[in-house]
């Protein structure tokens, strides 16, 4: 992982979009300020918007367009309805309401969950597979998902199954840790805007500390696996990072970094991220369980983590800070 070569996701207007959607040339700034939602994806076409018009039985005016890295973002007129949501999901396009979206140009904080958000795996499941107890641990995970166990109970029970597993299993998992697409770019982009980036995780320090170091994150907190004589004891040291702990981390860091709560973002995929999402100025469900998606303010369903920057970029339009010259 060459972290010296971290690239940002440039946010800028683009002539290709203007040529594809010439109607956006003549929109007034007043109309843009009224806009309340966006659509984004890797390649937006007039045909997709015609499908949306047909399905919603109305004309959906595009007020502005810009690029965020490889993504294309459209600022939309009118209200986002459940009909819009249905057709956009079918077209595999992301969308978000943008009222009160945090301001990228002011000090900000983003707190990410780790497992299945910052990285593509659930670390405990991978450790368990290598320790030969994959199925037992997966069964406990399933019970927790069904709400039979709370997070702390399920974590302690799963970790207990790892008793006597060799410590080198952890380094095996860490060596091939698959980052979520665009995690490094998300971090680099937000750092370039002067934002702070943190991980708050019910996972393990062995992995979150590694990510903190590799990506130059500002903070990371998760659970510590007890290791004695090169073996896991099956115990977690100290207090478990719970759903409430995650929210507390966000609030404490916001205070520490002098960031207004409005300018905080929480990103996660599981039920234990909901308290943190509710505490933040903007809660984003990322490739999340339906229950989590339903309760979150907004969601990224198809994009990588660059989708979070797509949502935040909308504030630049309202402030007339978007130009042909790329930001950050």
Swiss-Prot record:
What keywords would UniProt list here? Amino-acid biosynthesis, Hydrolase, Magnesium, Metal-binding, Serine biosynthesis
Q: Identify the residues that bind Mg(2+).
A: 113, 115, 269
EC number(s): the record gives 3.1.3.3
| Necessary cofactors | Mg(2+)
What's its top-level EC category? hydrolase
Query: Can you state which reaction this protein catalyses?
Result: O-phospho-L-serine + H2O = L-serine + phosphate; O-phospho-D-serine + H2O = D-serine + phosphate
Q: Would you name any one GO CC term?
A: cytoplasm
Question: Per its record, what are the GO molecular function terms?
Answer: L-phosphoserine phosphatase activity; magnesium ion binding
Active-site residues, as the UniProt record annotates them: 113, 115
| The family this protein is said to belong to | Belongs to the HAD-like hydrolase superfamily. SerB family.
* Descriptive protein name: Phosphoserine phosphatase
Originating species: Vibrio cholerae serotype O1 (strain ATCC 39315 / El Tor Inaba N16961)
């Amino acid at each position: 992982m060459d972290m010296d070569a971290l690239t940002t996701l440039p946010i800028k207007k683009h002539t290709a979009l203007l040529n594809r959607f010439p109607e956006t040339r003549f929109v007034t700034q007043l109309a843009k300020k009224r806009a309340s939602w966006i659509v984004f994806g890797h390649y937006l076409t007039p045909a997709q918007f015609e499908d949306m018009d047909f399905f919603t039985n109305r004309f959906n005016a595009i007020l502005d367009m810009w690029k965020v890295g490889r993504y294309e973002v459209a600022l939309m007129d009118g209200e986002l309805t459940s009909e819009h949501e249905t057709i956009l999901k079918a077209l595999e396009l992301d969308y978000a309401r943008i009222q009160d979206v945090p301001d990228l140009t002011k000090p900000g904080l983003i707190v990410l969950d780790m497992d299945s958000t910052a990285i593509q795996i659930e670390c405990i499941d991978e450790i368990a597979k290598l320790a030969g107890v994959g199925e037992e641990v997966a069964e406990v995970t399933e019970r927790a998902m069904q709400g039979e166990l709370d997070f702390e109970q399920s974590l302690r029970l799963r970790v207990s199954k790892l008793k006597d597993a060799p410590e080198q299993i952890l380094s095996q998992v860490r060596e091939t840790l698959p980052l979520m697409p665009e995690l490094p770019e998300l971090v680099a982009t937000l750092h370039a805007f002067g934002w702070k980036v943190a991980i708050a995780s019910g996972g393990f320090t062995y992995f979150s500390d590694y990510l903190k170091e590799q990506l130059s994150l500002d903070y990371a907190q998760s659970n510590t696996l007890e290791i004695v004589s090169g073996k896991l004891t099956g115990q977690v040291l100290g207090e478990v990072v719970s759903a409430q702990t995650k929210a507390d981390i966000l609030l404490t860091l916001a205070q520490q970094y002098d960031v207004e709560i409005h300018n905080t973002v929480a990103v996660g995929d599981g039920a234990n991220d909901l308290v943190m999402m509710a505490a933040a100025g903007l809660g984003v469900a990322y490739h999340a369980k339906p229950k989590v998606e339903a309760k979150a303010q907004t969601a990224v369903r198809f994009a990588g983590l660059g989708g979070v920057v797509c949502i935040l970029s909308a504030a630049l339009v309202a402030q007339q800070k978007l130009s042909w010259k790329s930001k950050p």
